[in-house]
């Protein structure tokens, strides 16, 4: 057997590539280099681990940021979804209900009525041979003494008839109550609870202007039989100014009329259906309104007394006459009216904010006037009223007639609203209970329709308001009803308002007008601006003369300041008494004039057995 060395040589001889190669292992060098290599490998692994941790941290941070962003987006989406749900439930659903009622119920009915109306007109204008033509005498041969537009008269008459029909059909579904309003039984002897509900929901032009921040002032509102009318001054800011620093205001006098509707929100909603907007002019400063028979009538004039001269009355005074139907029609009018005095004793006319009525095609208002025979007929009455403890009106300098020593009488203004009637204002007058201030007079129709209620508002911290009766036939007569005091030594018909004691209530800063409610028993409402609470309030006072009871409800205002004006108008609706108010105050913080408009629902519940 060959030795090991020979076998190694033989191996390298057979393998050519390694024939001249020798591997020499240096054990000392291996012992030195092996730890260095291990340290290098460990260092590289450590750097890799740090890099991986850094990458993981960056990705974790990005994931956290993305998660927060997704959460914010989800929160925003949830809020938007809730807002959409609110809009659908509380806004769109009632709106769709209204649209459905209009489209599905009322519109087809109105089209049916309109079709019947047109069909009747066709039959009317194309009658059978035996038809009596006397019914269309006005359209064929109007009387010569009446000056009318022959071509348009029949069309305008048809338009007014159609409007009346549409108004009646629209009001069929309303919940207007014509009976007692306070919802109390006569045998209620226990305590009562008064609850209120406020709403500023409206579909009116004034609501739009108020929402835009326009200045609204001198607003009066009138309601009746499911309709409403109002007039006010509005100042609109310039929207097209070239430079934002330049701001100017254009003033307008606005008239609007509409119906009071139930839109599924639980409150009555004023829905404007017709309006007129005129640039502010001197003859539009003071306006009085009358509502009825599906139309609104207004008389406006400058804010100053009107001097009456028999024979040429109204020559120097411009009186604006406005008539609007609940729906616009060619019969709407905006023109100047003339005064016609049939009484030569009249010499002065004093108009402020008055509410009137429309009956038998005629608008009627009651206003203070002066007569040349005032001292002859009422001199003794005034003298006796001012003898012992003279009330403030005896030495008043707040109103021109009283300052001049005149004794105002009651004037009744009427204007016919027919298409064939000229815009002429007739005036008659008569003396009655003493008139002590010029805060306005309002007319209301009594429940039985045999007379009118004539109200004068309270005088702040001085006198109570009065309710008188006014009868036109056979002759004008004004008689006291409540809240007046007889002056025995002044003659048979000598009455004054009820004056308060010298201790005035300093918390009551202003009184409103006095509103008569449509009920069998005489019921009326007035309001005061009260500052006795932390929050200023409009306090509504409800009086029932038939039940010898009274109630009140304070409505807290979101504004504070010195009151400038307070006007209310009340009506029954769905077993509640609702009162619309317009309150204007000088803000105690900013010194600017601000207003508050809305309706307050008052429900009085008897808690007795």
Swiss-Prot record:
SUPFAM superfamilies on file: Sialidases (SSF50939)
Keywords attached to this entry: Glycoprotein, Hemagglutinin, Host membrane, Host-virus interaction, Membrane, Signal-anchor, Transmembrane, Transmembrane helix, Viral attachment to host cell, Viral envelope protein, Virion, Virus entry into host cell
The keyword Coiled coil is assigned to this record: no
Topological domain ranges for the Intravirion compartment: 1-34
Entry's localization field: Virion membrane; Host membrane
Glycosylation sites: 168, 187, 200, 215, 395
GO molecular-function term, one example from the UniProt record: host cell surface receptor binding
Residues annotated as transmembrane: 35-58
Record's bilayer topology term: Single-pass type II membrane protein
GO biological process: symbiont entry into host cell; virion attachment to host cell
Regions of this protein lying in the Virion surface compartment: 59-609
GO CC term (a single one): membrane
Pfam families linked: HN (PF00423)
Cited function: Attaches the virus to cell receptors and thereby initiating infection. Binding of H protein to the receptor induces a conformational change that allows the F protein to trigger virion/cell membranes fusion. Down-regulates human MCP/CD46 cell surface expression.
Family, similarity comment: Belongs to the paramyxoviruses hemagglutinin-neuraminidase family. Non-sialidase subfamily.
Entry protein name: Hemagglutinin glycoprotein
Gene behind this protein: H
